[in-house]
Amino acid sequence: MLAIDESELNQHAMKWIEGIKKFTEAEDVVVCDGTPEEFKQISNELIKSGEFIKLNENRYPNSFLYRSDRTDVARSEERTFIAAPDASMAGSLNNHMTLQQVSEVWNKFFRGAYRGKTMFVIPYALGPLNSRFTDYGIEITDSRYVVLNLHYITRMGKQVIGSMPEKFVKGVHATGTLDPGNKFIIHIPWDKPEGVDADILSVNTNYGGNALLSKKCHALRIASVRARKEGWLAEHMLLLEVEDPHGRKVYITGAFPSASGKTNLAMINPPKQYAEAGWKTRLLSDDIAWMKMKDGMLYATNPENGFFAVVPGTNYRTNKNAMITLSRNTIFTNTGMTKTGEPWWEGLDPLQEELYDWKGVLRKPDGEPIAHPNSRFTSPLSNYPFLSDRSEDPEGVPVSAILFGGRRASLVPLVYEAFNWNHGVFMGATMGVEKTAASEGKVGELRRDPMAMRPFCGYNISDYFRHWIEMGRKLSRRPKIFYVNWFRRRQDGSFIWPGFSENFRVIEWILYRLDHNDNAIETPIGYIPENINTDGLNLTKQDMEELFRIDRDGWREEMKSIGDYFSQIGNIPEDLLIEFEMEKRRIS
């Protein structure tokens, strides 16, 4: 940690920091240097205060458990706001806040918020350093937990201080009282209220996406506004490298709403028969991809430097690479813990003995979950066993295919290909997830999550669709767009497709389609595979027919639902409405 006067930050940053210090009445200020010594010092302070528990050093070296407040366990969409002079700029899917309301929150909750506390200044960069993607930010916080998470998920500290530009994204976070009714996560991408010199404000929360301002707040909500203005894309997408047996490498991005298989696909290993044939996969990003144009193509990078991922359900069968990643140098949030100091969550081998649940209660693993369903692990990208050697490429990697996917029990085939770019945008704009349990609301109820950006687009979603259409016009070599659905079920409720590493069989067909015009059947909704490799899978002819069955009656109902959804959003781009009308005609 550095004293403010020895940090070598530029004068613009120093002036801003001094202003925040004065307003929040911080007792002292330190600039985070990002060193292992700093991490050790802060983690020891958290252990001493009881906020961190040191985990079993033999099984999980340099790893810790953090338990959040019981009311502060997930991103809070209903408490997340876009501040704009006019509500239409935020759009119907965002919560709008007036500039006057921002001023009120700033003065009520941030004035004196650090009284008696240390103010931590975290200089960070998103994207590979010294690249055309690099974007800088500073998060100011009173939370040591936030500091240590940013150690892992960003490039931060000394390595970015010297290159911090005069203009950077300014984020201010205050833990506050954790009062859920006064929790605010505010984004100010356009005009600022007088006296509020910040792009992001977060208060009365200390959880993940609400408090780690580099992540969803900067890398998606603020970045998406800038991307539209500057002509690029900031997307809630994985980024995967696939190498075929001939050594050819192809790069794929994919947008999936929560619980739709994004992390597992990002971390996929080819099944045994493919690996033996020479296929390889390598990760670039599990969560966010920034894409910029070059030579008529999209080139992508991961703006982040680590993982902050959901952990329940993860085991050596479902995601071996995640298990390797979280086995060291990891912060666990809201998992359970065994008496021997090992983290535990649902999906690991069942235990009969008592263990500590996510609230710290020692009990048998029956009844309520031991780990919170949204419990997380934070690990550096360098922990991952199969990282692409182009993860730091200053130019990014060329994107050949874009995947959209949702969780649908019926109707949507295992995979289908868009007829063209605009049709692909229509597919992404209308993707959705079915509720799968009574506790989540009505079973089968559909939540539309366009491009998986519903909670993360920093501006009006109809303008976002328009931006995608315009990007397609500018590209001479557009990625092909596909839709995947791993979750189609049989009549008895069981999943038809085995999923997990077997999803690679779908990737194989997608890669084939990038260079070939055959092995596809035209349907009213897009191209489906004529043949897909199912050798070794326990799938019947009836299963395969059901995986790709086009239910015209069901699709007519889907079109009605999409019409209602478009009416709710309003101002849908003409090109998208044309695709909608063409789809309806093909289905009728």
Curated annotation (Swiss-Prot):
Main location: cytoplasm
Ribonucleoprotein as UniProt keyword: no
Annotated GTP binding sites: A259, S260, G261, K262, T263, N264, R376, R407, F500, S501, E502, N503
Listed cofactors: Mn(2+)
Organism annotation: Thermoplasma acidophilum (strain ATCC 25905 / DSM 1728 / JCM 9062 / NBRC 15155 / AMRC-C165)
Organism domain of life: Archaea
Annotated protein name in UniProt: Phosphoenolpyruvate carboxykinase [GTP]
Sorted UniProt keywords: Cytoplasm, Decarboxylase, Gluconeogenesis, GTP-binding, Lyase, Manganese, Metal-binding, Nucleotide-binding
Role played: Catalyzes the conversion of oxaloacetate (OAA) to phosphoenolpyruvate (PEP), the rate-limiting step in the metabolic pathway that produces glucose from lactate and other precursors derived from the citric acid cycle.
EC number: 4.1.1.32
Record CDD domains: PEPCK_GTP
